[in-house]
Design a protein with these regions (language model features):
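Sec-dependent bacterial lipoprotein signal peptides
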Residues: 1-19
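Short, low-complexity N-terminal intrinsically disordered segments enriched in polar/charged residues
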Residues: 19-55
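Short beta-strand edge/turn micro-motifs at domain boundaries
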Residues: 20-30, 121, 133-168
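Extracytoplasmic/secreted proteins, especially bacterial periplasmic and envelope-associated proteins
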Residues: 37, 41-44, 48, 60, ...
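Short, well-ordered alpha-helical segments enriched in acidic and aromatic residues
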Residues: 55-72
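Loop/turn elements at helix/coil->beta-strand transitions in domains of secreted/extracellular proteins
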Residues: 58, 101-103, 155-158
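A short gly/proline-enriched turn/hairpin at secondary-structure junctions
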Residues: 70-82
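Surface-exposed, charged secondary-structure patches
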Residues: 84-136
Length: 168
């Protein structure tokens, strides 16, 4: 009996040590932080927007826009606001994604916010970098006045209006 205990006391530590791989990479505690939050959060919409631009993916981008989406910008040369709907926005974005080698958008700190749990308007600063080729890189810094809507508290937010408030 005493001999069996000694053998077990010797075998269990060996079994435990055999499960440890000193060459395995460490556990990445931050990996989950790179995944986008749910679309029930505004941050989730912005994260997916960033991913759509980074991966040049119109499917991701299209899922963020409401069917009645409107894009608006100011044409300072003519002194008028120019706008278009979701269909034209998707066509223009597809063209941008096809012509750019890489895209990067960084959403800066929230500048202003108003609304409630079903409709919210938020103004963000952004930095957009469009690389057409290594010698043709466009950088745009501006402000996006975004209006988000959702049907219910647990429903995903959709962008219904994007007013570009950049001055270029």
């Amino acid at each position: 009996m005493f001999r069996h205990k000694n053998i077990l006391l010797f075998i269990f530590p060996l079994i435990y040590l055999s499960c440890i791989n000193p060459f395995a990479p460490g556990w990445d505690d931050e990996a989950g932080q790179q995944i986008c939050p749910n679309l029930t959060e505004i941050e989730g919409v912005l994260c997916n927007f960033r991913n759509a631009y980074s991966f040049k993916d119109t499917t991701i981008y299209g899922n963020l826009l409401s069917p009645d989406f409107t894009f608006i910008y100011r044409d300072y040369d003519r002194g008028v606001d120019v706008s278009w709907g979701r269909e034209e926005e998707m066509r223009i974005t597809y063209g941008l994604f096809q012509s750019a080698q890489s895209l990067s958008i960084i959403w800066n700190k929230e500048i202003a916010s108003s609304g409630d749990s079903l409709r919210k308007t938020v103004v963000f600063g952004f930095n957009l970098t469009i690389t057409f080729n290594p010698s043709d890189i466009a950088r745009v810094d501006g402000y996006a006045n975004l209006t988000f809507e959702r049907v219910g508290f647990t429903s995903p937010w959709k962008i219904v209006r994007w007013r570009d408030e950049s001055n270029f």
